[in-house]
UniProtKB/Swiss-Prot annotation:
Family statement drawn from the similarity comment of this UniProt entry: Belongs to the UPF0434 family.
Family matches, as HAMAP family: UPF0434 (MF_01187)
InterPro entries named among the record's database cross-references: Trm112-like
Coiled-coil boundaries: none
Organism (species): Edwardsiella ictaluri (strain 93-146)
One protein family per Pfam: Trm112p
Top-level taxonomy: Bacteria, Pseudomonadati, Pseudomonadota, Gammaproteobacteria, Enterobacterales
Alphabetical list of PANTHER family matching this protein: PROTEIN PREY, MITOCHONDRIAL (PTHR33505:SF4), ZGC:162634 (PTHR33505)
Assigned GO CC terms: cytosol
Protein's name in the database: UPF0434 protein NT01EI_2448
Protein backbone atom coordinates (compact mmCIF):
# COMPACT_ATOMS: atom_id res chain seq x y z
CA UNK A 1 0.00 0.00 0.00
CA UNK A 2 1.41 3.34 -1.05
CA UNK A 3 1.76 5.63 1.98
CA UNK A 4 0.86 8.61 -0.23
CA UNK A 5 -2.55 7.07 -0.86
CA UNK A 6 -3.09 6.68 2.90
CA UNK A 7 -2.49 10.41 3.29
CA UNK A 8 -5.36 11.35 0.95
CA UNK A 9 -7.87 8.50 1.16
CA UNK A 10 -10.60 8.73 3.82
CA UNK A 11 -13.29 6.53 5.29
CA UNK A 12 -16.41 6.82 3.11
CA UNK A 13 -18.63 6.66 6.22
CA UNK A 14 -17.09 9.29 8.53
CA UNK A 15 -14.33 10.87 6.37
CA UNK A 16 -11.85 9.83 9.05
CA UNK A 17 -8.26 8.69 8.58
CA UNK A 18 -7.56 5.10 7.59
CA UNK A 19 -4.70 2.82 8.53
CA UNK A 20 -3.36 -0.15 6.59
CA UNK A 21 -3.53 -3.63 8.10
CA UNK A 22 -0.85 -5.50 6.19
CA UNK A 23 -1.73 -8.91 7.66
CA UNK A 24 -5.31 -8.77 6.35
CA UNK A 25 -4.62 -6.44 3.38
CA UNK A 26 -7.34 -4.02 4.51
CA UNK A 27 -7.78 -0.33 5.14
CA UNK A 28 -9.11 0.16 8.66
CA UNK A 29 -11.27 2.93 10.10
CA UNK A 30 -10.83 2.81 13.87
CA UNK A 31 -13.68 5.28 14.40
CA UNK A 32 -16.35 3.21 12.63
CA UNK A 33 -14.58 -0.12 13.32
CA UNK A 34 -14.73 -1.10 9.64
CA UNK A 35 -12.13 -2.79 7.45
CA UNK A 36 -12.21 -2.13 3.71
CA UNK A 37 -10.66 -4.86 1.55
CA UNK A 38 -8.05 -4.51 -1.16
CA UNK A 39 -8.73 -6.45 -4.35
CA UNK A 40 -5.83 -6.75 -6.76
CA UNK A 41 -4.19 -3.89 -4.87
CA UNK A 42 -7.21 -1.59 -5.29
CA UNK A 43 -9.12 -0.42 -2.20
CA UNK A 44 -12.83 -1.27 -2.27
CA UNK A 45 -14.28 1.73 -0.46
CA UNK A 46 -17.91 0.65 -0.26
CA UNK A 47 -19.57 0.40 3.14
CA UNK A 48 -21.45 -2.68 1.91
CA UNK A 49 -18.10 -4.42 1.23
CA UNK A 50 -16.52 -3.48 4.56
CA UNK A 51 -15.96 -6.00 7.31
CA UNK A 52 -17.07 -4.97 10.81
CA UNK A 53 -14.17 -5.26 13.25
CA UNK A 54 -14.64 -7.18 16.49
CA UNK A 55 -14.05 -5.14 19.65
CA UNK A 56 -10.63 -6.72 20.31
CA UNK A 57 -9.31 -6.21 16.75
CA UNK A 58 -7.71 -2.95 15.56
Amino acid sequence: MDHRLLEIIACPVCNGKLSFNQEHQELVCKIDRLAFPLRDGIPVMLESEARPLPQEEN
